[in-house]
């Protein structure tokens, strides 16, 4: 059983943090309840709490919610449906305009219950072509589309950018 902690004990993670610091980048460690704010926007950490535990280290990655005015986006990292269910029990949810599909669109994430609750207009999955895991899963993509969300994946679209133009959500893809 692995426990969430603010600072990773993984050598590669420590090395990456030191490299970032050496280039003048401020490294932040977040847990549920922490918020980073700018003048117009906020990024809130929803999960994990420092006391959370999980068998799979993926279930301890950050879940973040971005908000700017009426725009909200949910970034669930590599969490599974187990963590999605915890999040549904822990808080009241409002509609999320943009959802970064959990675990690259894995069949073990992006549960129907979560999608019904957050009702995303746009869902984006990040996955490499011909990846060994088969992400995004056809089952997950079907659940996402059946929820009424428009679905975009980096496999087809390359880099994906979501913006608000004249009060409308616009998703742009770039393939070289």
Each language-model region and where it sits:
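Non-globular, low-confidence helical/coil segments that flank catalytic cores
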Residues: 1-176
């Amino acid at each position: 059983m692995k426990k969430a902690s603010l600072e990773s004990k993984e050598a590669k993670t420590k090395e990456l943090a030191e490299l970032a610091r050496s280039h003048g980048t401020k490294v932040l460690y977040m847990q549920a309840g922490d918020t980073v704010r700018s003048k117009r926007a906020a990024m809130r950490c929803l999960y994990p709490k420092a006391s959370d535990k999980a068998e799979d280290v993926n279930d301890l990655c950050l879940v973040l919610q971005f908000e700017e005015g009426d725009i909200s986006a949910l970034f669930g990292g590599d969490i599974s449906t187990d963590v999605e269910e915890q999040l549904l029990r822990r808080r009241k949810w409002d509609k999320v305009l943009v959802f970064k599909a959990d675990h690259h669109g894995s069949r073990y994430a992006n549960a129907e219950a979560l999608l019904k609750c957050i009702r995303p207009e746009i869902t984006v999955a990040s996955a490499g072509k011909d990846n060994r895991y088969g992400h995004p899963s056809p089952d997950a993509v079907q659940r996402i589309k059946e929820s009424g969300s428009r679905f975009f994946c980096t496999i087809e679209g390359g880099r994906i950018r979501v913006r608000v133009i004249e009060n409308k959500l616009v998703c742009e893809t770039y393939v070289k």
